[in-house]
């Protein structure tokens, strides 16, 4: 089920109440905004080109706040700094080594949560008759589905 994996777990966690947010940013895209360009590309003469599919780059604080608002929940208000995340990473590895719990943090994951890398998904819009869905509408739809 969607709410048990991937982005769905994030929605479920925010619905339960999320107090912390990573300090980095993330590129987001709706599922339909991945599928529709793929179909358009298969029907086009475009060959051997790569496309980045990102509708918007958002700070985690803003993204999690928008999702929380659409779920009628309080937005997270405490930053998860790089130092705090690395402390959690070390604790995670210790608990894993002791056999107490399964590991969930990696150095790469910590770095990605703190990264402010921006992605440009505009190439697909220039090459095809395509435009990304409004992020706000997509998040509201997902939140409505979750509440149902």
Question: Model-found features: residue ranges?
Answer:
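Residue-level signal for the nucleotide or nucleotide-sugar donor/cofactor binding architecture
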Residues: 29-32, 58, 133
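Aromatic-glycine-rich donor-binding/catalytic loop that engages nucleotide-sugar donors
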Residues: 127-131
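A short, mixed-charge helix-start or loop-turn motif at secondary-structure junctions
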Residues: 19-20, 103-106
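NAD(P)-dependent short-chain dehydrogenase/reductase
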Residues: 1-27
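Mid/C-terminal beta-alpha module of Rossmann-like enzyme folds, strongest
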Residues: 37-104, 121, 135-146
